[in-house]
Amino acid sequence: MNSLAQVRDLVRPDLGAVDAVIRASMKSSVDLVDQIAEHIISGGGKRMRPLIVLLAARACGYRGSGHIDAAAFIEFIHTATLLHDDVVDGSSRRRGRATANAVFGNQASVLVGDFVYSRAFQMMAAIGSQRVMEIMSEATNFDCSVHKRAYLHLK
């Protein structure tokens, strides 16, 4: 067994709970959103960001359940960023398969990226921590400024 698998084993039940929250929170009344969400979720990925959140919670002795939602909204922000980046970069493949924008089009991909961002912020608000909102707002703003500079550099 490789070391990453061993690390995952430490928080395997929590990773399952995060995946359940991700699937439930991606549900929409719009079929196209559900199709794109399934395309994204079924694409796999290592879920490194949620893993780090879960490991940090464990290392700090956290005993609640808020870390599950925190891990999910971190993954949502990452996913939204990837959806938008693939459109900006004109990417057609990620992890060996067609990107959402290649399959569903740029407009749908951007709109679902926006949907995923909005769900992330709903989940953050539900945690009820002003500090979490401040940190994540700053991080998201920083991420946007980095991508804006990268885009301007490409032009």
Please state what every model-predicted region is.
Residues M1-A24:
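N-terminal amphipathic/basic leader segments beginning at the initiator methionine
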Residues G16, R23-K155:
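Mg2+-dependent prenyl diphosphate-binding active-site environment of isoprenoid biosynthetic enzymes
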